[in-house]
């Protein structure tokens, strides 16, 4: 059994690998998720060229149908499998929290028909700004600013919308509603959505810039989450004095709980990879865990149902993967996974209920191949066993498989 000095977990946000067994219990625009397959459909529809992930074993992961343009490796350099979600949700928080060992049996509240008048009125009274009622429904984040951004620029009204996720999002043009004001309004919205019937996973500030017809969301997004309801493996590590580094929106997702080094938000996937490599190179980071989220797959291409853009984003990550591998020390372990699906060829605009891939690599590996299929929380149990801390609620370690 290997024991690694450092483990680096990279979440490719929304890069699912085929419909989960219970996918038909979830839907997009009235269409059950049972036929969703993020990687499979991208590979089939627009082609997928990811030789570096293929070398680690991406094409070796068992599937009903092989990935069309990602061949299995006869001698992969890593271990591979797919993992199933048990929690009742397909949102970012649920996925990440389960990866860190929690089972979410009661999902957060979602608002398919928009938020109740009581919430909107409270936000209006607090902010002194009106809320655009027509935007108050599940909406694509880019479409909502295209549709209501011009009106906001004229009136200063707030754009409040939601999605299939348990989130309240406030979009604000940075020249009309300053960032400090937007963040203050979001903090208030967080304070009034902490219990049922409006228990939301996140309040998200969605600033943007530009002119009508050419709006662009900025990297000044900020998430206001709730802390996990029980200790995750992040907390177990932190309590044991083991370093935990967060790259990208990880700190927001866990509300800082169990994280003792926040490396900041990502401006892009490429910036996030730069930050990860910088983190891996820190001389003080001798032992511990880094946790990175790369969100562009989901935010820029999955929700927009842009299969070509999604494919290109995967290509860009794959091209930079050798840099990550080169930054590893001999006794490091790299885990690459996802948190849910977001099939860009599917109905609707929201996440899809899918298996997630898992690729594992270490310079110290003497073996490779496919390991048994498991569940999201197995990642956290493996991390816990490696560092000698107690696991969280659920999960079975696969550390013994990594040789």
Curated annotation (Swiss-Prot):
Cofactor note: Binds 2 manganese ions.
SUPFAM superfamilies found in the cross-reference section: Alkaline phosphatase-like (SSF53649), DeoB insert domain-like (SSF143856)
Requisite cofactors: Mn(2+)
A Gene Ontology BP annotation from the UniProt entry: 5-phosphoribose 1-diphosphate biosynthetic process
NCBIfam families per record: deoB, PRK05362.1
Cellular component GO terms, alphabetical: cytosol
EC number(s) from the headed UniProt entry: 5.4.2.7
Protein name: Phosphopentomutase
Family from the record: Belongs to the phosphopentomutase family.
Entry's transmembrane regions: none
Residues where Mn(2+) 2 binds: 298, 303, 351
Catalytic reaction list: 2-deoxy-alpha-D-ribose 1-phosphate = 2-deoxy-D-ribose 5-phosphate; alpha-D-ribose 1-phosphate = D-ribose 5-phosphate
């Amino acid at each position: 059994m290997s024991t690694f000095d450092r483990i680096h977990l990279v979440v490719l946000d929304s890069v699912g690998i085929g419909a989960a067994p219970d996918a038909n219990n979830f839907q997009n625009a009235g269409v059950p998720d049972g036929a969703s397959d993020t990687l499979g459909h991208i590979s089939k529809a627009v082609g997928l060229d990811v030789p570096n992930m293929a070398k680690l074993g991406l094409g070796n992961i068992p599937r009903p149908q092989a990935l069309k343009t990602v061949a299995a490796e006869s001698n992969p350099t890593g271990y591979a499998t797919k993992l199933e979600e048990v929690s009742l949700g397909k949102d970012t928080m649920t996925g990440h929290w389960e990866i860190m060992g929690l089972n979410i049996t009661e999902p957060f509240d979602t608002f398919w028909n928009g938020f109740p008048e009581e919430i909107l009125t409270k936000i209006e009274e607090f902010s002194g700004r009106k809320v655009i009622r027509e935007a108050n429904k599940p909406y694509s984040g880019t479409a909502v600013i295209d549709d209501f951004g011009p009106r906001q620029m004229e009136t200063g009204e707030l754009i409040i919308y939601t999605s299939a996720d348990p989130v309240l999002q406030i979009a604000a043009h940075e020249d009309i509603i300053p960032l400090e004001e937007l963040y203050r309004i979001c903090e208030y919205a967080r304070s009034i959505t902490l219990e049922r019937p409006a228990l939301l996973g996140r309040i998200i500030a969605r600033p943007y810039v530009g002119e009508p017809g050419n709006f662009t969301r900025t990297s000044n997004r900020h998430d206001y989450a709730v802390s996990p309801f029980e200790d995750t493996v992040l907390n177990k590590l932190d309590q044991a004095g083991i370093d935990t580094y967060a790259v990208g929106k990880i700190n927001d997702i866990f509300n800082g709980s169990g994280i003792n080094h926040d490396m900041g938000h990502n401006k892009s996937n490429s910036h996030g990879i730069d930050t990860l490599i910088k983190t891996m190179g820190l001389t003080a980071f001798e032992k511990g865990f880094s946790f990175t989220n790369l969100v562009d797959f989901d935010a820029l291409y999955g929700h927009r149902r842009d299969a070509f853009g999604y494919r290109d984003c995967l290509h860009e990550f794959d091209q930079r993967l050798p840099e990550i591998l080169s930054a590893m020390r001999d006794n490091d372990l790299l885990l690459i996974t996802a948190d849910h699906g977001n099939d860009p060829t599917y109905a609707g605009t929201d996440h899809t209920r899918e298996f997630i891939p898992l690729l594992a690599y270490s310079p110290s590996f003497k073996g490779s191949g496919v390991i048994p299929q498991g569940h999201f929380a197995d990642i956290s149990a493996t991390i816990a066993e490696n560092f000698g801390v107690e696991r969280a609620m659920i999960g079975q370690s696969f550390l013994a498989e990594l040789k």
